[in-house]
UniProtKB/Swiss-Prot annotation:
Keywords: Cytoplasm, Methyltransferase, S-adenosyl-L-methionine, Transferase, tRNA processing. This is tRNA1(Val) (adenine(37)-N6)-methyltransferase. It comes from Histophilus somni (strain 129Pt) (Haemophilus somnus). Belongs to the methyltransferase superfamily. tRNA (adenine-N(6)-)-methyltransferase family. Specifically methylates the adenine in position 37 of tRNA(1)(Val) (anticodon cmo5UAC). One of its GO terms (biological process) is tRNA processing. The lineage of its organism: Bacteria, Pseudomonadati, Pseudomonadota, Gammaproteobacteria, Pasteurellales.
Amino acid sequence: MAKKQEFTFKQFHINQDQCAMKVGTDGILLGAWANINQANTLLDLGTGTGLIALMLAQRSPEHCHISAVELDPQAYLQAKDNIQQSPWANKIKIFQQDIIVFAQDCEHKFDVITANPPYFKQGIDCASKQRNLARYTLTQSHLDWLNAAEKLLNLTGEIHLILPFEEGKSLQKKCGLFCIRECKIITKAGKTPQRLLLSFSREERKCEESQLVIYDRNNQYSTEFKTLTQDFYLNF
């Protein structure tokens, strides 16, 4: 089934006909869950439609500065347009660049960094090179993404990611940062976790563990999911 070419939230609108990766639950979860308390500078890596950057802009105080990075030229232009049409056009700056190159060249450090990185390993080719680029882990691993984020992170900053469950568990063992929050995402009550929301820091502290169920046993959105995302979804 074809996904919608546009998506309207309570305070902003997303056009996505030029983006390989459309608005999805993963991005909405991350944008709503990431801890941005006391953050002044925020960065979204691989911004796609600009969804997470816009969610962070909605959630953060007016004085905050948000940067977003997107490699694909079509997605970059559409994200830029989505941002310009939003209430936070002066709050968000977007860059068309590879995240590894951006991490090497950028002189600024950030208090909060978010990323919803590609997660399907290369197998059957996607219908377009654009979607291939957006969806598959081709040349950059999840560890590459985390390492790039670490280079851009303030000493007391936090990195927030969403990943498939097994990949998220594997990344925790490989990286040199401390996992300080972990939320298991369960699509439907009674099922096993499919995703992990993760927060990393340079500072060691006890990891806060939780879980979130999206649909209850009656196939209705759970109270916890609606509570987390109610500032964004029109029907909550």
